[in-house]
Amino acid sequence: LDNKEAKMFAFFSAILIILTGCTTGEEEPPAVVDGPERDLSEEAEQPNEDNEQQVREAVEEIEHIHDMAFDREEEGILYVGTHYGLMHADLNSGEFYWQGTEEDRHDFMGFLITAENIFMSSGHPGHGSELENPLGVMKSEDHGGTWETGALYSEVDFHLMDANEGDSEYLYGFDAYGGRMFKSQDGGEDWSEVSAEGINDRFHELYSIISDPEDSERVLAGMANGIYESLDGGENFNLFNNELTMTSVSQGPDGILFANGIGRIEGLMKSTDFGETWEVVGELPEEAAPVLAIAVDHNNTDTLAIGTASDSIYWSDDQGKTWQLIVENGEPA
């Protein structure tokens, strides 16, 4: 195997291991208790939209990092979709706790936060939930404290989701449950399947999707052999860049893309022209590979976070020049 093939093999292997453990959502969750070095008591109050009080449970361990995104209103607040719930990570204070009660701690696969700070996700019902599997498209308007099921309930399991930054009425999702790609033009209320010609026979090689804030019908897809482009809302894809691919991608303000690259560029890369050109940004720690998720803070684009196949999370406050390990092998550092 050449270097690119070896990297792709490692990434495929990591994805396979994670997906094998994320199919039913019926396993017992790990214990959640207060971390010994964090000022976070079991009696801490977490207000929700109805001003009810919930008990914050500090994170002792996470398993299977699937996706992550930063809060749109408050700087330095990272949310991480995992096998056993949505983790709230405050990079300012070092506090890590689970969002919501046990019945709302699902196996969050695809996860995003829209420009309006609406949380959306998909996946499998968690321990204690009576919901059907898969969950379809879920929404939360209280930072993931509570979730409501909606479109495609019990029909799809979106492992990849994207909300257009220019028009969040436009959303895209890849359903790993049925091997299909969908599009919504009304904020996720209604969805239609798109044909995805050009990549639909290789969905097992699809890593990432992102749409252009200046043209919501333009979509980039990171595939094993390069980046593909659709100009018609996901109906047809053509090879756009065969020199590199993006195994995970996040969009910052003004359409800036940050991605984990494999190929001509290895590691963190940035594009200011929506994928036309890419440049190296900083340097990822060697032990961070393979990277499964990446997020940029819209409140401060110097702040980045990555999640790895080893259930580790790193964050940077200087756009990738230096990194701090905050979760190591599933345990808050």
Predicted features and spans:
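Asp-box/BNR beta-propeller loop motif
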Residues: Y84-R105, N133-A151, G178-I199, Y228-N241, ...
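Repeated scaffold domains used in trafficking and secretory/extracellular systems
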Residues: I65-A69, H106-L112, V156-A163, F203-I210, ...
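Hydrophobic beta-strand positions that form the internal "hydrophobic ladder"
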Residues: L78, I118-F119, L171, V219, ...
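C-terminal motif of bacterial Sec signal peptides marking the signal peptidase cleavage site
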Residues: I18-G21
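Residue-level detector of Asp-centered blade-edge/turn motifs that repeat once per structural unit
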Residues: F70-E75, I113-E116, A163-S168, P213-D215, ...
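Bacterial signal peptide processing site
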Residues: T23-G25
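Short, solvent-exposed loop/turn segments at conserved positions within beta-propeller repeat blades
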Residues: G128-P134, F174-G178, R202, G222, ...
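Beta-strand-rich domains and repeat architectures in extracellular enzymes and scaffolds
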Residues: Q54-M87
